[in-house]
Amino acid sequence: VHPDSGTCFLRASDGSEVEMNADSRSMFSYVPQGNTVLSGTIAENMRLVREDATDEEIINALKVACAWDFVSRNPAGINAKVGERGRGLSEGQAQRLAIARAVLRDAPILLLDEATSALDVETERNVLRNIIKQRPNKTCIVTTHRPTVLSLCKRVYRVVKGTVTELDEEESAKSVMDF
């Protein structure tokens, strides 16, 4: 969707507004569908967003993203090496590392752009539930083609031919069936 007019701003619950510009980018953590893991250790990949992160903070973020299960099985743990674009990891594991990195960044708004597409349905739901529990007063925006996540969302919007529509609870439940 490419806008041809208008402005974009964020409104806080207290009514204050922030204009969207280069400075407001720090308010976002973004996880794309594609693989964003770099060569190095898991800890080095995580510290790309917070150089001062402790091992404990990294492990907590990995747990939120359901990545600690496979990281902890490696004798090197968070010091395990991964190749460029996550070589040595499955796509689902690489996606969970990217999500953990975004969680560690702890920005007020988390954007997950098809970021769980390589995960099975159960893991995807667990990751999203963990994010919701860990970030109760923050915003998480999920773009998806999978209906399974819609029931976890407070608000559901559908984009069709450039038009954005908010679905009410009944429409949202029906859209799960229509996918």
Language-model features: where?
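H-loop (His-switch) and adjacent beta-strand-loop-beta switch element
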Residues: 153-169
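Conserved post-Walker A segment of ABC ATPase nucleotide-binding domains
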Residues: 1-63, 126, 132-137
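Hydrophobic anchor residue at the start of the ABC signature
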Residues: 93, 99, 127, 143
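Conserved H-loop
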Residues: 137-144
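Catalytic Walker B motif of ABC-type/P-loop ATPase nucleotide-binding domains
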Residues: 110-114
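Helix N-cap at the start of a conserved alpha-helix in ABC-type nucleotide-binding domains
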Residues: 121-122
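A short, proline-enriched helix->beta-strand linker immediately N-terminal to the Walker B motif
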Residues: 104-108, 137
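ABC-fold ATPase nucleotide-binding domain signature/coupling loops
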Residues: 11-18, 68-97, 169-170, 176-179
